[in-house]
């Protein structure tokens, strides 16, 4: 048994220059571990609450000194002496100490930082890599990297409404090869943008953020870039979207490409995209509160591709269960800071998988060098990970960790590839 001896925390900066929480845990056997908490730009209304200081004279009110103090003054003392391997008990102690349904008293950023740091310390004490400690002996599937190479929406200051245009190297034989294919396509896209006289500035997640006339223009540019690499559009490299529709949804519908649109119209628009492009996944095609619309689009498109709930489910078992009951969506995005603890995240993933929902592990737009989600993707067998473009070190850190995991697994490693998207089997793509 390795017990918790000390818990510390500090305020650090994330990839957008905003403060976030970093937690350190020391065990009685000398084991030490550290974890940092990410933060989102487009956040769902039903996410667990971050604790921010609100002092406009310091970091524009985004400081996290109060969350740091909560870790040091309340959470740490409550956990000292607990067995670090009892993750569920440790998380329960913190949830009870917080006492709110949204973790608003201590802050989800405080609780999650401790939860992840404890898990990493326990894995180290057990002399196991984190993916093996969390996933057991059967953790061996490397995820498809869903690379966000064109940024729009809340991740870029342009006229493109859809937030993320992703490539998925489904035809690769290994994660290592998939990463190369993605990086080569990324660089090919930069060349295409330069040739067109378009901006090659980067959005929050490392993707390019050109100002384009329409969302289809972004897809066309990516298809052109894939063609320049020599890879086959669809069978080698498929496409995916994160629409983040909640960001442009109001009381009178969806404000999309200059017009007010209904959920039915949006569904028809996506049906057109699916028929024209090799799309394997659409995330948040409709708003987080548009349950009727989600039922409609799932009925129309759920048999053809993955419909991912991010803002809809917020990695919350209760929200996910509602989606399961209503047949709204067929996949869940997994963001550890949406729910705010490791065990609650694992419970949500388990519920999804038991009910035939796929899962996609995900970063946030405000990231750090922490690589926990890479291990977590392999541990739970998500088969997909979304952690940005193959650029910016806070994104690449996760990809590099997956390279290490694949190397460690050696012959036991299996790359998910096209099998991660069974609903899209047989699509032909567009030449």
From Swiss-Prot:
Cofactor note: Binds a second Mg(2+) ion via substrate during catalysis.
GO cellular component: cell surface; extracellular region; phosphopyruvate hydratase complex
Metabolic or biological pathway, per its Swiss-Prot or TrEMBL entry: Carbohydrate degradation; glycolysis; pyruvate from D-glyceraldehyde 3-phosphate: step 4/5
Cofactor requirements of the protein: Mg(2+)
Sequence positions that bind Mg(2+): 242, 283, 310
Annotated InterPro entries: Enolase, Enolase-like_C_sf, Enolase-like_N, Enolase_C, Enolase_CS, Enolase_N
Location(s), subcellular: Cytoplasm; Secreted; Cell surface
Source domain of life: Bacteria
Catalyzed reactions: (2R)-2-phosphoglycerate = phosphoenolpyruvate + H2O
GO molecular function: magnesium ion binding; phosphopyruvate hydratase activity
PROSITE patterns, per database record: ENOLASE
Residues the record lists as binding (2R)-2-phosphoglycerate: 163, 335, 364-365, 386
SMART domains tied to this protein: Enolase_C, Enolase_N
Keyword annotations: Cytoplasm, Glycolysis, Lyase, Magnesium, Metal-binding, Secreted
Any matching Pfam family: Enolase_C
EC numbers: 4.2.1.11
Catalytic residue positions: 205, 335
Family that this chain belongs to: Belongs to the enolase family.
Cited function: Catalyzes the reversible conversion of 2-phosphoglycerate (2-PG) into phosphoenolpyruvate (PEP). It is essential for the degradation of carbohydrates via glycolysis.
Database matches in NCBIfam families: eno (TIGR01060)
HAMAP family tied to this protein: Enolase
Protein name: Enolase
Organism: Kineococcus radiotolerans (strain ATCC BAA-149 / DSM 14245 / SRS30216)
